[in-house]
Swiss-Prot record:
Domain ATP-grasp: 107-318
Gene name linked to the record: ITPK4
Binding site for 1D-myo-inositol 1,3,4-trisphosphate: 65, 157, 190, 291
Residues that coordinate or bind ATP: 101, 146, 179-190, 205
Catalytic activity as recorded in UniProt: 1D-myo-inositol 3,4,5,6-tetrakisphosphate + ATP = 1D-myo-inositol 1,3,4,5,6-pentakisphosphate + ADP + H(+); 1D-myo-inositol 1,3,4-trisphosphate + ATP = 1D-myo-inositol 1,3,4,5-tetrakisphosphate + ADP + H(+); 1D-myo-inositol 1,3,4-trisphosphate + ATP = 1D-myo-inositol 1,3,4,6-tetrakisphosphate + ADP + H(+)
Quaternary assembly: Monomer.
InterPro entries: Inositol_tetrakis-P_1-kinase, InsP(3)kin_ATP-grasp, ITPK1_N
Any one cellular-component term (Gene Ontology): cytoplasm
List of residues binding Mg(2+) 2: 289, 291
Protein name as annotated: Inositol-tetrakisphosphate 1-kinase 4
Length: 355
């Protein structure tokens, strides 16, 4: 992890605007973050999304996670009028692929690290033939059924674990993704990425599915499941609890995070990684989900990580990662920053922008 950046009292003060849904504000912009940022010369200000962006500020940096098209239009208008001022994190065009589960995981195939994605198929037609879809994708039960769109709604998180074919048919309301469920010992590795920092946190996950469950015709063919990965695993014990050395090596995690960051062209995201352990294949890692601008309060030390990141962006010392994966081509906000680019509208309009 990069060392914390100091902020002398004589340094200029910056204003960082944030446009987030209320539930995201409560999971990121906590008093501990606000206090530390202020102590380091960064003022955090909420953007009123009901008002024109041009009437607010001035901001030196904008961070956002909004799904409204009107918000995106405002960002594009602001970028056209004042390119690079304020600095926008992250580019709406780069975020888009994470809002569609058909494209979300495409970037993984371009990584140079030994990690992959479970087999999956996109169901885009409600009249699709389940047998044909499953055969074409060579999927094996159990499956996870996920809504195709990731739009922040409760419906986008409505997932089901499907044990056999007759559990698929009622779900073909389309569009959705059917992804093969991989037994992973009930352990999920949630990796939070903030710029070039990656922090891996072990979480509990769905338990393994025994073969006999797939053959139990008296049991439900599919069941809904809640996201239970937000609870830390208990400390290791004598009853088979997860041990500290179960966590992937830091170097491996950093390499995966770096590849995703470059491939996606994003700075702020997390990804869910699982590990299959078998005598046949040994240890195999899979990425099953990538989420833009997660609830960082669940990441240890997130206040310092975000504050350091804001200062790096504002001081022009943090280059935007080159997008290498499918769909390359970043919007104008996402390009390499040069020193002095992190300035506010106040300096631009007064002609006092620092070089």
């Amino acid at each position: 992890m990069a060392p914390e950046l100091s902020s002398p009292s004589s340094s200029p003060r910056y204003t960082v605007g944030y446009a987030l849904l209320p539930e995201k504000v409560s999971s990121v912009v906590r008093p501990s973050l606000v206090a530390l940022a202020a102590d380091r010369g960064v003022r955090l200000v909420a953007v009123d999304v009901s008002r024109p962006l041009a009437e607010q500020g001035p901001f030196d940096l904008l961070v956002h996670k909004m799904y409204d098209r009107g918000w995106r239009a405002q960002l594009e208008e602001l970028a056209a009028r004042h390119p690079g001022v304020p600095v926008v994190v992250d580019s709406p065009g780069a975020i888009d692929r994470l809002l569609d589960r058909a494209t979300m995981l495409d970037v993984v195939s371009g990584l140079r690290t030994p990690v992959s994605v479970p087999p999956q198929v996109v169901v885009s037609d409600a009249a699709a033939d389940a047998d044909e879809l499953l055969a074409r994708a060579a999927l094996r039960f159990p499956l996870i059924a996920k809504p195709l769109a990731v739009d922040g709604s409760a419906e986008s998180h409505d997932m089901r674990l499907v044990y056999r074919r007759d559990g698929v048919l009622p779900l073909l309301r389309a569009p959705l993704v059917l992804q093969e469920f991989v037994n992973h010992g009930g352990v999920l590795f949630k990796v939070y990425v903030v710029g070039d920092r990656a922090t891996c946190v072990r979480r509990s996950s769905l338990p393994d599915v025994p073969a006999r469950r797939l053959l139990d015709l008296d049991a439900e063919p599919s069941v809904p499941f809640a996201n239970i990965s937000n609870q830390p695993l208990p400390p290791p014990d004598d009853d088979g609890g997860a041990a500290d050395d179960d966590t992937p090596a830091a170097g491996f995690v950093d390499e995966v995070a770096r590849g995703l960051r470059r491939g996606l062209g994003l700075h702020l995201f997390n990804f869910d990684m699982i590990r299959e352990r078998s005598e046949e294949h040994g240890d195999r890692y899979f990425i099953i989900d990538i989420n833009y601008f997660p609830g960082y309060a669940k990441m240890p030390g997130y206040e310092a990580a975000l504050t350091d990141f804001f200062l790096e962006m504002l001081r022009g010392t943090r280059p935007v990662p080159e997008q290498l994966g499918p769909g390359s081509g970043l919007d104008m906000e996402a390009r390499k920053l040069e020193p002095g680019l992190g300035i506010g509208l106040r300096e631009l309009e007064s002609g006092r922008a620092q070089a």
